[in-house]
Amino acid sequence: MKSVKELNKKEMQQINGGAISYGNGVYCNKEKCWVNKAENKQAITGIVIGGWASSLAGMGH
């Protein structure tokens, strides 16, 4: 080995068989991209709830 780097937890979570995780259920490697539907659904739900909560907070002004 020429060099070794200790990975932190976030970096370890992004390793998926040489693919890059974009944190929303989308993964890409050199050949293709794909979606993990369970992760994607959770990410979209979080975005929707966050937007809904922000709009409610803004209604009080």
Curated annotation (Swiss-Prot):
The keyword Cytoplasm does not apply. The keyword Secreted applies. Disulfide bonds join C28-C33. Residues 1-18 form a propeptide. Has antibacterial activity against Listeria and Enterococcus. Belongs to the bacteriocin class IIA/YGNGV family. This is Bacteriocin carnobacteriocin BM1. The lineage of its organism: Bacteria, Bacillati, Bacillota, Bacilli, Lactobacillales. The gene is cbnBM1.
